[in-house]
From Swiss-Prot:
Family: Belongs to the amidase family. GatA subfamily.
Protein name: Glutamyl-tRNA(Gln) amidotransferase subunit A
Class of this enzyme: ligase
GO biological process annotation, one example: translation
Organism (species): Cupriavidus taiwanensis (strain DSM 17343 / BCRC 17206 / CCUG 44338 / CIP 107171 / LMG 19424 / R1) (Ralstonia taiwanensis (strain LMG 19424))
Annotated catalysed reactions: L-glutamyl-tRNA(Gln) + L-glutamine + ATP + H2O = L-glutaminyl-tRNA(Gln) + L-glutamate + ADP + phosphate + H(+)
Amino acid sequence: MPFSADSVTSLRQLADALAARTVSAEELAREYLARIEQAAALNAFIHVDAELTLAQARAADERRARGEAAPLTGVPVAHKDVFVTRGWRATAGSKMLGNYESPFDATVVERMAAAGMVTLGKTNMDEFAMGSSNENSHFGPVRNPWDAGRVPGGSSGGSAAAVAAGLAPAATGTDTGGSIRQPASFSGITGIKPTYGRVSRYGMIAFASSLDQGGPMAHTAEDCALLLNAMAGFDPKDSTSIPPAQGGVDEDYTRLLGQPRAGATAERPLAGLRIGLPREYFGKGLSADVEQAVRAALAEYEKLGATLVEVSLPKTELSIPVYYVIAPAEASSNLSRFDGVRYGHRAAEYRDLLDMYKKTRAEGFGAEVKRRILVGTYVLSHGYYDAYYLQAQKIRRIIADDFQRAFAQCDVIMGPVAPTVAWKLGEKTSDPVQMYLADIFTLSTSLAGLPGMSVPCGFGEGNMPVGLQLIGNYFDEARLLQAAHAFQQATDWHLRRPAKA
């Protein structure tokens, strides 16, 4: 019987099949390329180049034949189109960069290529990572594989949909205010945002530099740990990358997987783990179906030996206005480079240089990006800087301190990723504030720079996936992954697939 990726439930199984020569990297790449073509209606990918992909796959097979294979050699991966890539376009989902091809690879792309992984293509995303539904892309919205009439989440919606639909076994994403965790939740997959500075931002098209962080998206916690091993590490080319002296040491993120905590048993592997439940995450605004799935997951953790402890994150509600002051301010600065002079879109007709600037930016940016540039420029302007931007930064510090007080009472914080399941396409596009409110449970983690992840924990309204959010202290990814892996060993939510996939 010929090999099929449908029989594989994890990257380790895929890697084992490649190592055993059950399937070649080229055969695997061809299978996934065919799937991408068949599922074009999902609009998960912006750019696919079969020749480039197959060339990488053949190189991976040759590397294995020479006995030089790494653990992930030959494993396919899709890259969010915010990472620049040689050969493939790098658009950030925008008309402004519609035909841009980078002369270099982002560090994340470079490191995964060095591990022997094979690029399947570039995934769709909200323009410049600004959005929670993947409806802001210049290349059209991505559809959720569980229900094509609903959003997959954003801004890494293309990556989430690609993994959920079986178009890629793994993908990269970025998380500025929840853009890995929320689409992972909406699409029924696993995703992790590492501690800010763990993964290099070099070659990642910037939205908000003090918040943007790359991370992996896949089916399981073990998959994400393997991918983090390839992605993470200090990068001298990124000034925000954490050097070893400050905690950014290389580590094996799989080292605690399947290991009981000290003093625990195989039946209760998480005995002694204190799980903090923020009371602010379980109040008004959380839909009953999401709360039911999250509570059931927490009960499963109790069976695994963990103890539930109530904690407080009192500034949770303020995370929305704080984020939507700081992030647009940084975007206003970062996106000023797109002016039509050096690269990207340029207006076809203009009178002079100033007219070219105006027309280029008016034509090149979408409505949501323009909105955030305007907000960001306003809060940075003379007379408003102290009232808005400076105040937001002060509250950001308080939010980070609140987390540290909570971690004095617990080891890991858990709760919902989003207040609801994925909504219908077009349902919130006319009301930006309602769209922003969907990020209330993920923004504070990003503002504090903490690691956070989403794991599938059930289904809600319309049989749509629900994600459980796990938040750890700085550099505590291994413990987060251990807790997520233990849950996935005891449940099968991560094995569920959309019927049409």
